[in-house]
Amino acid sequence: MPPDLRMQPLPFPMMTLTSETKLDLEKAGVLVLGVEPSADSGESSDGKTTANCIAVSSLPESLAATVKNACSSGEVTGKPGELTSFATGNAQTPWIVLAGLGASDKRTRGSAIELGAAVVRSLASKPRQQITFALGDGVATENHDAVVAGAVSGCEGQHLYQREPSISVPEAIAFVGYSAESVSRGEKLGQSINHTRRLVNEPPSIMNPTGFAQYAEKIASDCGLTCEVWDEKKLEAENCRAILAVGRASTSPPRLVMLRHDGGGDEAPLVVVGKGVTFDSGGLSLKPSDGMVDMKCDMAGAATVVGVMNALAKLKVPRNVIGLCGLAENMVSGDSYKLGDVIETRSGKTIEILNTDAEGRVVLADTLDVAVQQKPQAIVDLATLTGACMVALGIDVAGLMTNNQALCDAVQSAAESECEPVWQLPMFSLYDDKVKSKVADIKNVGEGRWGGAITAAKFLENFVADVPWVHIDIAGPAFVDSPKPHRDAGATGVMVRSLVRWIENAS
């Protein structure tokens, strides 16, 4: 057995969140006020740029004067994402953050979640007892939960094993004028995003298939999901030969995690499937070091499934939903699966292996067949599947591919509502021949360099039977190299919000 390399990461970020009917300056701590560009030209008589503080009327006269002076100083514009912090000299409210909201017709759920996260991150350099958001009517009521979700997600980063953490979690955050329901929903969404990010950001020595399954079991126990874990013996009994082939070179054997949320009575379930390659060396088709350094993130699809299922359970969504995570570590040993191997999958279809670094689709072949066995209304899978999708769409956009346009439209609409950019790629039948094999039913890579994201989806289409299905390639947006004001580098938790919205709206 390998040595136990598990360490204790920083605790999962938890803080007290409250809904307040009115501003109490005696316990406000750091006060966050929303500002927008002035309704006129945005310039004062002396040519300085001006802004308008939306909730200034709720402040006592002396503090209101301080805020108005700042807004007319020329340093505050109210542009979206702009944060201006200053000491007030006021004993009750010693520190204020003016948060730019932008023009009212440009404010979205995306800007709301980024606002909440950016504010908290800007204050995270030292411990804070209390942060109070008093944004007035600067954020639409239907987006209040997004501000809260952002504030929560802003407390999580990739600094899990720093001896001196770069993010200090505030003890409490209050939201003035937000309903208790909005605060509760936002907290649950933010925590679910953070669970996804935590899973991806953990080192691969810890978040291997066994470690991932244990994390999922803990989540299920905490939020009331049913959890079933298939170990290697169960995988053998279920004829999951594709998952076993990918993972057999690793000392950490494969797993399949099934999470079940029963909220919809007798209706057929929706199934969300995630690729969970907890580390991808490329196998015998070995990646170079530069291509391997971030490959702990190759299980972001499965991590997203866990985040989505946690949110559904916490929000008590009235739907039946099953989350499936196919977990394997793609390593190198004398027992590695090889180029030229033919694998009989759980469905009975055979795969010719021409590249062991196209392993995610092989893992998904069996996992999707398990999904089909659940007799679902629809299947959505997520995977960091292809670099080709990043070449096609860039690193910020997820690719959608489908066998059912109505389902794809519903998923795309949900993503657009949550401001998570997606784009549909074609699934023309002319691509079918690209994955046909001369020695097996199909092969695990297409012909040549072209259309790689689509040929990967065409491979997966072989394993969904006639079930309505959408494949989401999140290779670009799931993991990023550089931080932004609203999030750390590393895992992003992309598509958790979008899939929760899709499931809530599913008819």
From Swiss-Prot:
Co-factor binding comment:
Binds 2 manganese ions per subunit.
Which UniProt keyword terms apply here? Aminopeptidase, Cytoplasm, Hydrolase, Manganese, Metal-binding, Protease
Residues the record lists as binding Mn(2+) 1: D280, D357, E359
Name any cofactors this protein relies on. Mn(2+)
Q: What reaction does this enzyme carry out catalytically?
A: Release of an N-terminal amino acid, Xaa-|-Yaa-, in which Xaa is preferably Leu, but may be other amino acids including Pro although not Arg or Lys, and Yaa may be Pro. Amino acid amides and methyl esters are also readily hydrolyzed, but rates on arylamides are exceedingly low; Release of an N-terminal amino acid, preferentially leucine, but not glutamic or aspartic acids
According to its UniProt entry, one GO biological process term is:
proteolysis
Q: What is its main location?
A: cytoplasm
Keyword Manganese (UniProt):
yes
What Gene Ontology cellular-component terms does the record carry?
Answer: cytoplasm
PANTHER family hit by this protein: CYTOSOL AMINOPEPTIDASE, LEUCINE AMINOPEPTIDASE-RELATED
Name the job this protein performs.
Presumably involved in the processing and regular turnover of intracellular proteins. Catalyzes the removal of unsubstituted N-terminal amino acids from various peptides.
Q: Which family does it belong to?
A: Belongs to the peptidase M17 family.
Q: What is this protein called?
A: Probable cytosol aminopeptidase
Taxonomic classification: Bacteria, Pseudomonadati, Planctomycetota, Planctomycetia, Pirellulales
Q: What is this protein's gene name?
A: pepA
